Regions:
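Catalytic core of pol beta-like nucleotidyltransferases
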Residues: 1-132, 137-145, 153-359
Length: 359
Protein backbone atom coordinates (compact mmCIF):
# COMPACT_ATOMS: atom_id res chain seq x y z
CA UNK A 1 0.00 0.00 0.00
CA UNK A 2 1.28 3.43 -0.92
CA UNK A 3 0.24 6.88 -2.21
CA UNK A 4 -3.32 6.83 -3.59
CA UNK A 5 -4.58 3.91 -1.48
CA UNK A 6 -6.98 4.31 1.44
CA UNK A 7 -7.70 2.15 4.48
CA UNK A 8 -10.53 1.81 6.97
CA UNK A 9 -9.63 0.98 10.55
CA UNK A 10 -11.20 -1.01 13.35
CA UNK A 11 -12.51 2.31 14.72
CA UNK A 12 -14.32 3.08 11.48
CA UNK A 13 -11.87 5.83 10.51
CA UNK A 14 -10.81 6.22 6.89
CA UNK A 15 -7.24 7.31 6.14
CA UNK A 16 -5.51 8.12 2.85
CA UNK A 17 -2.05 6.61 2.51
CA UNK A 18 0.82 9.08 1.96
CA UNK A 19 4.14 8.46 0.30
CA UNK A 20 5.98 5.34 -0.82
CA UNK A 21 8.04 4.45 2.26
CA UNK A 22 6.40 3.09 5.42
CA UNK A 23 7.43 1.44 8.69
CA UNK A 24 6.99 -2.35 8.80
CA UNK A 25 4.21 -2.21 11.39
CA UNK A 26 2.39 0.99 10.36
CA UNK A 27 1.19 2.94 7.33
CA UNK A 28 1.84 6.67 7.16
CA UNK A 29 -1.63 8.00 6.36
CA UNK A 30 -3.79 11.07 6.97
CA UNK A 31 -7.23 10.99 8.54
CA UNK A 32 -9.86 11.77 5.90
CA UNK A 33 -13.28 10.62 7.17
CA UNK A 34 -14.66 9.72 10.57
CA UNK A 35 -18.10 8.51 11.71
CA UNK A 36 -20.27 11.47 12.77
CA UNK A 37 -24.08 11.45 13.22
CA UNK A 38 -24.09 15.04 11.89
CA UNK A 39 -21.84 14.27 8.93
CA UNK A 40 -22.77 15.17 5.35
CA UNK A 41 -21.64 11.83 3.84
CA UNK A 42 -23.41 8.52 4.20
CA UNK A 43 -22.33 5.00 3.36
CA UNK A 44 -24.08 1.76 4.28
CA UNK A 45 -26.31 3.54 6.76
CA UNK A 46 -23.46 5.28 8.61
CA UNK A 47 -22.91 9.04 8.41
CA UNK A 48 -19.38 10.40 8.08
CA UNK A 49 -17.66 13.76 8.14
CA UNK A 50 -14.69 14.70 6.01
CA UNK A 51 -11.80 16.30 7.88
CA UNK A 52 -10.02 18.82 5.66
CA UNK A 53 -7.51 20.70 7.81
CA UNK A 54 -4.34 19.02 9.07
CA UNK A 55 -4.64 20.81 12.41
CA UNK A 56 -8.15 19.43 12.92
CA UNK A 57 -6.99 15.94 12.01
CA UNK A 58 -4.26 16.18 14.62
CA UNK A 59 -6.65 17.46 17.28
CA UNK A 60 -9.17 14.67 16.67
CA UNK A 61 -6.51 11.99 16.84
CA UNK A 62 -4.84 13.44 19.93
CA UNK A 63 -8.12 13.74 21.82
CA UNK A 64 -9.94 10.60 20.69
CA UNK A 65 -7.68 8.21 18.76
CA UNK A 66 -4.07 8.52 20.01
CA UNK A 67 -3.21 5.07 18.64
CA UNK A 68 -3.00 6.71 15.19
CA UNK A 69 -0.24 9.12 16.20
CA UNK A 70 3.31 7.91 16.68
CA UNK A 71 6.80 9.32 16.85
CA UNK A 72 8.76 7.70 14.05
CA UNK A 73 12.48 7.14 14.67
CA UNK A 74 13.33 7.28 10.95
CA UNK A 75 11.24 10.31 9.97
CA UNK A 76 12.16 12.02 13.23
CA UNK A 77 8.72 13.50 13.85
CA UNK A 78 5.28 12.55 15.08
CA UNK A 79 3.27 11.21 12.14
CA UNK A 80 -0.31 10.22 11.55
CA UNK A 81 -0.13 6.50 10.91
CA UNK A 82 -2.30 3.40 11.01
CA UNK A 83 -1.04 0.29 12.84
CA UNK A 84 -1.34 -2.53 10.35
CA UNK A 85 -3.10 -4.67 12.97
CA UNK A 86 -5.97 -2.13 13.01
CA UNK A 87 -6.58 -2.14 9.24
CA UNK A 88 -9.89 -3.72 8.33
CA UNK A 89 -10.41 -2.69 4.69
CA UNK A 90 -7.92 -1.74 1.97
CA UNK A 91 -9.05 0.43 -0.95
CA UNK A 92 -6.87 -0.06 -4.04
CA UNK A 93 -7.37 2.60 -6.79
CA UNK A 94 -6.58 0.23 -9.67
CA UNK A 95 -8.80 -2.55 -8.32
CA UNK A 96 -11.63 -0.08 -7.76
CA UNK A 97 -11.38 1.12 -11.36
CA UNK A 98 -11.58 -2.48 -12.56
CA UNK A 99 -14.65 -3.04 -10.35
CA UNK A 100 -16.43 0.05 -11.71
CA UNK A 101 -15.70 -0.94 -15.30
CA UNK A 102 -17.03 -4.43 -14.65
CA UNK A 103 -20.28 -3.46 -12.89
CA UNK A 104 -20.86 -0.08 -14.51
CA UNK A 105 -21.33 3.31 -12.85
CA UNK A 106 -23.91 3.67 -10.08
CA UNK A 107 -24.22 7.45 -10.44
CA UNK A 108 -23.07 10.42 -12.52
CA UNK A 109 -19.87 10.94 -10.53
CA UNK A 110 -18.72 7.39 -11.22
CA UNK A 111 -19.76 7.75 -14.86
CA UNK A 112 -17.65 10.89 -15.25
CA UNK A 113 -14.70 9.19 -13.56
CA UNK A 114 -14.88 6.29 -16.02
CA UNK A 115 -15.20 8.64 -18.99
CA UNK A 116 -12.15 10.61 -17.90
CA UNK A 117 -10.15 7.40 -17.46
CA UNK A 118 -11.12 6.33 -20.99
CA UNK A 119 -10.16 9.75 -22.40
CA UNK A 120 -6.74 9.73 -20.77
CA UNK A 121 -6.03 6.09 -21.56
CA UNK A 122 -6.90 6.59 -25.23
CA UNK A 123 -5.11 9.94 -25.63
CA UNK A 124 -1.94 8.89 -23.80
CA UNK A 125 -1.95 5.28 -25.04
CA UNK A 126 -1.01 3.82 -21.65
CA UNK A 127 -2.02 0.47 -20.13
CA UNK A 128 -5.25 0.60 -18.18
CA UNK A 129 -3.51 -1.22 -15.32
CA UNK A 130 -1.55 1.98 -14.60
CA UNK A 131 -4.69 4.03 -13.94
CA UNK A 132 -6.81 4.17 -10.82
CA UNK A 133 -9.63 6.05 -9.13
CA UNK A 134 -8.86 7.70 -5.81
CA UNK A 135 -10.46 10.30 -3.56
CA UNK A 136 -14.05 10.10 -2.34
CA UNK A 137 -15.15 7.79 -5.18
CA UNK A 138 -12.58 5.19 -4.10
CA UNK A 139 -14.11 4.85 -0.63
CA UNK A 140 -17.76 5.39 -1.61
CA UNK A 141 -18.00 8.78 0.10
CA UNK A 142 -18.74 10.93 -2.93
CA UNK A 143 -21.69 13.29 -3.27
CA UNK A 144 -23.39 14.52 -6.46
CA UNK A 145 -21.06 17.56 -6.54
CA UNK A 146 -17.85 15.65 -5.75
CA UNK A 147 -14.64 16.01 -7.73
CA UNK A 148 -13.13 13.21 -9.78
CA UNK A 149 -9.70 12.16 -8.51
CA UNK A 150 -7.52 9.85 -10.57
CA UNK A 151 -4.06 8.42 -10.02
CA UNK A 152 -1.53 7.34 -12.65
CA UNK A 153 1.06 4.81 -11.46
CA UNK A 154 4.47 4.35 -13.02
CA UNK A 155 6.99 6.90 -14.29
CA UNK A 156 6.55 6.23 -18.02
CA UNK A 157 2.75 6.17 -17.82
CA UNK A 158 2.77 9.31 -15.67
CA UNK A 159 4.85 11.26 -18.16
CA UNK A 160 2.71 10.05 -21.07
CA UNK A 161 -0.54 11.08 -19.37
CA UNK A 162 1.03 14.40 -18.38
CA UNK A 163 1.85 15.13 -22.03
CA UNK A 164 -1.65 14.08 -23.07
CA UNK A 165 -3.22 16.38 -20.49
CA UNK A 166 -1.26 19.33 -21.81
CA UNK A 167 -2.47 18.64 -25.34
CA UNK A 168 -6.06 18.30 -24.16
CA UNK A 169 -5.97 21.47 -22.06
CA UNK A 170 -4.23 23.51 -24.75
CA UNK A 171 -6.82 22.55 -27.37
CA UNK A 172 -9.18 25.46 -28.19
CA UNK A 173 -12.17 23.24 -27.51
CA UNK A 174 -12.59 19.78 -26.11
CA UNK A 175 -13.86 17.72 -23.20
CA UNK A 176 -11.21 18.95 -20.76
CA UNK A 177 -10.51 22.59 -19.90
CA UNK A 178 -8.72 24.72 -17.36
CA UNK A 179 -10.68 26.30 -14.47
CA UNK A 180 -12.11 29.74 -15.21
CA UNK A 181 -11.57 32.74 -12.94
CA UNK A 182 -14.57 31.97 -10.73
CA UNK A 183 -13.52 28.34 -10.33
CA UNK A 184 -9.95 29.39 -9.57
CA UNK A 185 -11.26 31.75 -6.89
CA UNK A 186 -13.06 28.83 -5.24
CA UNK A 187 -9.87 26.72 -5.33
CA UNK A 188 -7.87 29.61 -3.91
CA UNK A 189 -10.32 30.05 -1.05
CA UNK A 190 -10.04 26.34 -0.24
CA UNK A 191 -6.21 26.35 -0.21
CA UNK A 192 -5.66 29.78 1.34
CA UNK A 193 -5.83 28.68 5.02
CA UNK A 194 -2.79 26.45 4.42
CA UNK A 195 -0.87 28.42 1.79
CA UNK A 196 -0.79 32.23 2.07
CA UNK A 197 -0.64 33.19 -1.60
CA UNK A 198 -2.51 36.05 -3.21
CA UNK A 199 -5.10 35.16 -5.82
CA UNK A 200 -2.82 36.50 -8.57
CA UNK A 201 0.07 34.31 -7.40
CA UNK A 202 -2.20 31.28 -7.07
CA UNK A 203 -3.72 31.77 -10.54
CA UNK A 204 -0.29 32.18 -12.12
CA UNK A 205 0.96 28.94 -10.55
CA UNK A 206 -2.17 27.01 -11.53
CA UNK A 207 -1.73 28.08 -15.15
CA UNK A 208 1.57 26.15 -15.21
CA UNK A 209 -0.04 22.87 -14.25
CA UNK A 210 -2.01 20.25 -16.11
CA UNK A 211 -3.13 17.98 -13.28
CA UNK A 212 -6.19 20.01 -12.33
CA UNK A 213 -9.06 20.93 -14.62
CA UNK A 214 -12.74 20.67 -15.43
CA UNK A 215 -14.36 17.67 -17.09
CA UNK A 216 -18.09 17.36 -17.82
CA UNK A 217 -18.67 20.40 -15.59
CA UNK A 218 -16.84 18.78 -12.69
CA UNK A 219 -13.47 19.49 -11.05
CA UNK A 220 -10.88 16.79 -11.64
CA UNK A 221 -7.44 16.17 -10.18
CA UNK A 222 -4.87 13.73 -11.54
CA UNK A 223 -2.01 12.54 -9.33
CA UNK A 224 1.16 10.98 -10.75
CA UNK A 225 2.89 8.40 -8.55
CA UNK A 226 5.95 6.30 -9.28
CA UNK A 227 5.83 2.62 -8.45
CA UNK A 228 7.75 2.00 -5.21
CA UNK A 229 10.13 -0.29 -7.11
CA UNK A 230 11.05 2.62 -9.40
CA UNK A 231 12.13 4.67 -6.39
CA UNK A 232 13.92 1.76 -4.75
CA UNK A 233 13.95 3.16 -1.24
CA UNK A 234 13.23 1.04 1.81
CA UNK A 235 12.25 2.22 5.26
CA UNK A 236 15.43 3.09 7.12
CA UNK A 237 17.62 3.64 4.06
CA UNK A 238 17.63 7.31 5.07
CA UNK A 239 17.07 8.89 8.46
CA UNK A 240 15.65 12.39 8.84
CA UNK A 241 16.39 14.92 11.57
CA UNK A 242 14.03 17.93 11.83
CA UNK A 243 15.93 21.17 12.44
CA UNK A 244 13.32 23.93 12.22
CA UNK A 245 11.36 25.94 9.73
CA UNK A 246 13.12 28.03 7.11
CA UNK A 247 12.52 30.28 4.15
CA UNK A 248 15.08 29.96 1.37
CA UNK A 249 15.98 31.38 -2.00
CA UNK A 250 17.49 28.84 -4.38
CA UNK A 251 18.12 28.15 -8.05
CA UNK A 252 16.27 25.14 -9.46
CA UNK A 253 18.62 22.76 -11.28
CA UNK A 254 16.37 19.71 -11.82
CA UNK A 255 12.57 19.51 -12.00
CA UNK A 256 12.17 16.09 -13.62
CA UNK A 257 10.24 14.77 -10.63
CA UNK A 258 8.09 17.88 -10.22
CA UNK A 259 4.97 16.20 -11.64
CA UNK A 260 5.01 13.28 -9.19
CA UNK A 261 3.75 12.85 -5.65
CA UNK A 262 6.00 13.09 -3.72
CA UNK A 263 7.61 15.81 -5.85
CA UNK A 264 11.27 16.83 -5.78
CA UNK A 265 13.26 19.82 -7.01
CA UNK A 266 17.06 19.79 -6.96
CA UNK A 267 18.47 23.20 -5.97
CA UNK A 268 21.77 25.05 -5.73
CA UNK A 269 22.99 28.49 -4.63
CA UNK A 270 20.80 28.37 -1.53
CA UNK A 271 20.39 31.44 0.65
CA UNK A 272 18.51 31.35 3.96
CA UNK A 273 16.09 34.26 4.23
CA UNK A 274 14.50 33.30 7.54
CA UNK A 275 14.77 30.52 10.12
CA UNK A 276 12.91 29.43 13.24
CA UNK A 277 14.13 26.58 15.48
CA UNK A 278 12.20 23.63 16.84
CA UNK A 279 13.16 20.33 18.43
CA UNK A 280 16.76 21.46 18.68
CA UNK A 281 18.06 22.57 22.12
CA UNK A 282 19.38 26.10 22.00
CA UNK A 283 17.93 26.86 18.59
CA UNK A 284 19.62 28.20 15.51
CA UNK A 285 22.36 30.78 15.25
CA UNK A 286 21.88 32.38 11.86
CA UNK A 287 22.82 35.47 9.93
CA UNK A 288 19.97 36.16 7.51
CA UNK A 289 21.16 36.11 3.94
CA UNK A 290 24.00 33.72 4.76
CA UNK A 291 24.41 30.53 2.79
CA UNK A 292 25.35 28.54 5.88
CA UNK A 293 23.33 28.33 9.07
CA UNK A 294 25.24 27.26 12.18
CA UNK A 295 23.84 25.60 15.28
CA UNK A 296 25.14 26.32 18.81
CA UNK A 297 27.15 23.09 18.74
CA UNK A 298 29.00 24.37 15.68
CA UNK A 299 27.46 21.98 13.13
CA UNK A 300 26.54 23.74 9.88
CA UNK A 301 23.43 23.46 7.76
CA UNK A 302 25.23 23.25 4.45
CA UNK A 303 24.67 21.28 1.27
CA UNK A 304 20.92 21.87 1.05
CA UNK A 305 20.27 19.87 -2.12
CA UNK A 306 16.54 19.61 -2.61
CA UNK A 307 13.05 20.90 -1.96
CA UNK A 308 10.46 18.13 -1.63
CA UNK A 309 6.75 17.90 -0.90
CA UNK A 310 4.37 15.06 -0.14
CA UNK A 311 1.39 17.23 -1.11
CA UNK A 312 0.14 17.01 -4.70
CA UNK A 313 -0.58 20.70 -4.97
CA UNK A 314 3.12 21.64 -4.75
CA UNK A 315 3.97 19.84 -7.99
CA UNK A 316 5.03 21.88 -11.03
CA UNK A 317 5.42 25.05 -8.98
CA UNK A 318 8.88 26.03 -10.25
CA UNK A 319 11.04 25.12 -13.24
CA UNK A 320 14.68 24.51 -14.08
CA UNK A 321 16.66 27.73 -14.24
CA UNK A 322 14.24 29.72 -12.11
CA UNK A 323 14.97 31.17 -8.70
CA UNK A 324 12.57 29.74 -6.16
CA UNK A 325 11.38 31.12 -2.84
CA UNK A 326 10.24 28.35 -0.50
CA UNK A 327 9.08 28.08 3.09
CA UNK A 328 9.00 24.72 4.82
CA UNK A 329 10.65 22.41 7.34
CA UNK A 330 14.41 22.06 7.27
CA UNK A 331 15.71 18.50 7.65
CA UNK A 332 19.09 16.84 7.85
CA UNK A 333 19.08 13.67 5.75
CA UNK A 334 21.37 10.87 6.90
CA UNK A 335 21.65 8.01 4.36
CA UNK A 336 22.59 4.54 5.53
CA UNK A 337 25.52 4.79 3.12
CA UNK A 338 26.95 8.11 2.03
CA UNK A 339 27.35 11.64 3.36
CA UNK A 340 24.56 13.57 5.08
CA UNK A 341 22.88 16.53 3.39
CA UNK A 342 19.88 18.81 3.95
CA UNK A 343 16.50 19.33 2.35
CA UNK A 344 13.45 21.56 2.74
CA UNK A 345 10.06 19.84 3.05
CA UNK A 346 7.15 22.00 1.89
CA UNK A 347 3.53 21.40 2.83
CA UNK A 348 3.82 19.87 6.27
CA UNK A 349 2.63 23.00 8.05
CA UNK A 350 0.15 25.77 7.42
CA UNK A 351 1.88 28.73 5.83
CA UNK A 352 4.33 26.73 3.70
CA UNK A 353 4.75 27.83 0.10
CA UNK A 354 6.86 27.36 -3.02
CA UNK A 355 6.91 29.77 -5.95
CA UNK A 356 9.28 31.32 -8.44
CA UNK A 357 10.92 34.62 -7.58
CA UNK A 358 9.39 37.50 -9.47
CA UNK A 359 11.38 40.56 -10.49
Amino acid sequence: MFEGFAVQTADGLIFTVKGLVHPPDRLVAYLRYLPDPQGDREREGVRYRRVYRFEEQQEILQMRYPAYLSHDPVFGIQVQSVPRRLIRTVYDPCCHLATLRRRGPADLVEEHALRLVDLLQETADVPLKNLGISGSVLVGMHRPDSDVDLVVYGEAAGRAVHRALRRLLDAPSGPLRRPNREELAALHAMHRPDTPLSFAEFARLQARKVNEGRFQGRSCFIRFVKWPAEVGERYGDRRFEPLGSATIRARVTDDRDAIFTPCRYAVEDVTFLETAPFLRPGGLCVTLGAQTVTFPDGSPVADLREVVSFRGRFGEQVRVGEWAIARGSLERVVPRNGPAYHRLVVGGRAGDYLLEERA
